């Protein structure tokens, strides 16, 4: 879990009360935020918090203070953030590498050393958590008074413009930034092709080269009073969610929020948008999940402590909830129920010890997983662990498969478009891992063992009509990767598992015809292997031959 270091005086100032170390140690964990340690640094008391990944709004001292004020009853209900319209415009062109953007203006903010440190730390934590190290989104915060509107977000050639990158006094082109600047070298893999995203002002002064570096011109300091916030990325939800979190944090510092008009091919949108979300939940649903007997008033009180607005509808006999825009973690009613539990107080729940003592042991499938892991590692492969959620593009389109020819389980309310399908296969995710590591040396040999989810109309478990299928998959890439190499790996693994099998020719759209085989056990096809089709290799932007296999674990 990510950790943040918070200056205790700054935290107390935002909460508007003094806090003893004992209070911090006791109260914050009950709010769902672990206190790692309290220590002194440069004669200042520092509190280190461990933040759950599902609460990115807690990655700043402003967010923690906002949540704590509600938790202890200083504030209640939805925080109010006024947005004033500015006359500033941003012209957005078609930026293929990072097509989504969001902008906001914060005026009249007082920035001292603590505020500046908080802004920088929040940026970096959000880059890692929501941004996946700037892949999904990147943040830029600038001194507004040093630039002139309108602003332009567009693509340019690598040598089309020169600017001073942040922290440097040397003029560089975008191409030179990727070759010479430490941030450019580190994040060059995020920009492919000969066009580079850039944000400039009316006078063509460079504000930012996302997701790499800001311009030196707009560097923020303690003298800054007005800010331009820009978020760009590959994931629309990530961009919008990040902008909301940052804008609310800066508003909690008494900054005033102003919107801008984004103009894209004649279409106009206003940014930021802090419109609250809404949800409905019944009293029975909450009480059944928590094992409590709360009435509507008690539930609403808990919800308001969690900084929701809530009211009971006698007509519908449910509770209507308004969710603040910075709560990007709310996916369904279970998240709301968890907040009710936290603000009811975990210490108020009664626990009963089980009547019968039990001793756990590894499930048979876990024993097989462990055996396969050890065998694959013995063959010189590295284990990776991908997310169970992916998307149709990675799982099917890039694998030369028609989506219509495949059945899969789709998430009802995905957190992002990149994670809306439960994987029915592992192989595409391994290819995506290779794509993310193509800047590393060859050969690369990786495998994964884990569950996939497939449609099964006969399965009545929880009425889902789907089931888990354990699988093992591996890929190998280097200059001379070939069919015989992957065939030897597959046969070696199956022999180690002491399974009778046979191999026959197989036609699969992801593999080269004539260089693909199926694995047959008990007259049933349990897997396949071979040389990946050149189109698949190009779809994942890989530069060398790739071989791979995937097999069910019976």
Swiss-Prot record:
Its cofactor is Mg(2+). Pfam families: B3_4 (PF03483), B5 (PF03484), PhetRS_B1 (PF18262), tRNA_synthFbeta (PF17759). Coiled coil: none annotated. It catalyses: tRNA(Phe) + L-phenylalanine + ATP = L-phenylalanyl-tRNA(Phe) + AMP + diphosphate + H(+). InterPro entries: aa-tRNA-synth_II/BPL/LPL, B3/B4_tRNA-bd, DNA-bd_dom_put_sf, Phe-tRNA-ligase_IIc_bsu, Phe-tRNA-synth_IIc_bsu_arc_euk, Phe-tRNA_synthase-like_B3/B4, Phe_tRNA_ligase_beta2_arc, PheRS_beta_core. CDD domains: PheRS_beta_core. It is found in: Cytoplasm. Its EC number is 6.1.1.20. GO terms for molecular function: ATP binding; magnesium ion binding; phenylalanine-tRNA ligase activity; RNA binding. GO terms for biological process: phenylalanyl-tRNA aminoacylation. Keywords: Aminoacyl-tRNA synthetase, ATP-binding, Cytoplasm, Ligase, Magnesium, Metal-binding, Nucleotide-binding, Protein biosynthesis. Its main location: cytoplasm. The keyword Cell division does not apply. Mg(2+) binds at residues 329, 335, 339. One of its GO terms (cellular component) is phenylalanine-tRNA ligase complex. Residues 274-351 form the B5 domain. It comes from the Archaea. Tetramer of two alpha and two beta subunits. Belongs to the phenylalanyl-tRNA synthetase beta subunit family. Type 2 subfamily. This is Phenylalanine--tRNA ligase beta subunit. It comes from Methanococcus aeolicus (strain ATCC BAA-1280 / DSM 17508 / OCM 812 / Nankai-3).
